[in-house]
Amino acid sequence: MKKLLILILTTLFFNSFCYADKNMKIGSKGNLNEVSRTIKVKMYDNYYEPSSFSIEAGETIKFEVENVGMLVHEFNIANKMMHIKHQPEMSKMAENGILLAFSIDKEKMKKMAKMDKSMGHSHSNSVLLEPKQKGEIIWKFINAVNIEIACNVPGHYQAGMIAKVNIN
């Protein structure tokens, strides 16, 4: 009986630890009718403007993102661990000829997404843009802690394409 109790407690502990990654406190997709303000963001080659964001806890923000750089860039709301876990997906997209330096092969992306959903890059916390493209994200910063906005295109995060998010 004691061994069974230890096994159950150990399983519960490890399951809650493992599932914590999937439920990291970064907020959630927001609704347009709840937007409190709009922040315009420009993505240059390996930096964002603005370079940091001050956001009130619980606030819903509409990010209007424009890639003014010469390379493909990503605007991704997550914490450091989530960015690191997302980077192999982005590398796989590059290895499969989907993610190129100056463009995204959307036809290949659609085909790959049928086999591997992560290759569709349809995350609600992220937008992947070619040069001169615009996109938007509506995000609710509820229970959000340790957030950073980063580009996970191979090499860009490592080059410092990260913006700090201060939750007040």
Label every model-predicted segment.
Residues 15-20:
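Sec/Tat signal peptide C-region and signal peptidase I cleavage site
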Residues 79-85, 166-168:
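Short edge-strand/loop segments of extracellular domains
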Residues 21-28, 43, 47, 70-71, ...:
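Extracellular/periplasmic metallocenter environments
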Residues 88-112:
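Extracellular/luminal beta-rich ligand-recognition
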Residues 29-61:
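N-terminal edge beta-strand
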Residues 74-78:
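Beta-strand signatures of extracellular beta-sandwich domains
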Residues 4-13:
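Sec-dependent N-terminal signal peptides
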Residues 65-69:
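Asparagine-centered strand-capping/turn motif at beta-strand->loop junctions
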